[in-house]
UniProtKB/Swiss-Prot annotation:
Belongs to the ATPase B chain family. It comes from Cucumis sativus (Cucumber). In plastids the F-type ATPase is also known as CF(1)CF(0). It is found in: Plastid, Chloroplast thylakoid membrane. GO terms for molecular function: proton-transporting ATP synthase activity, rotational mechanism. The gene is atpF. This is ATP synthase subunit b, chloroplastic. The lineage of its organism: Eukaryota, Viridiplantae, Streptophyta, Embryophyta, Tracheophyta. HAMAP family: ATP_synth_b_bprime.
Amino acid sequence: MKNVTDSFISLGYWPSAESFGFNTDILATNPINLSVVLGVLIFFGKGVLSDLLDNRKQRILKTIQNSEELRGGAIEQLEKARARLRKVEMEADQFRVNGYSEIEREKLNLINSTSKSLEQLENYKNETIRFEQQKAINQVRQQVFQQALQGALGTLNSCLDNELHLRTISANIGMFGTMKEITN
């Protein structure tokens, strides 16, 4: 028991920690623990790092291969464009040799066809305008007819009472009977 008491008493004599911080003294930080941690990181990290580098290498090689293919396609298109340019230049030389009469003829044909197209468009426009005007007129007529019909029905409903209504029905039935006798 005396040893336990002595140990608690000795705790009171320990100097208190002055501050909390990082120990930058390599010799005071356990070099064995650091070497074990570094060894584990190198051992297990080597495979992951080599896989990452291999993947990156493959992507770079694919990118280079794609660039080479695109370069080849661009060179091929450039050659085709140059061939077309040579062909167009030869045709231009032929036009110059033959003179500008062909160009003038084409110009007149283009002007004539354009004027015909404009004329047709004008005719289509006029037909469309006439159609829309007729459509608007028909709509107005229909609305006027509907309003007149509603007005007439309103007038009839306000003027008709039951007795007048029965007399009108009787007169119409009588006219219908007379028409039926005439047709027989």
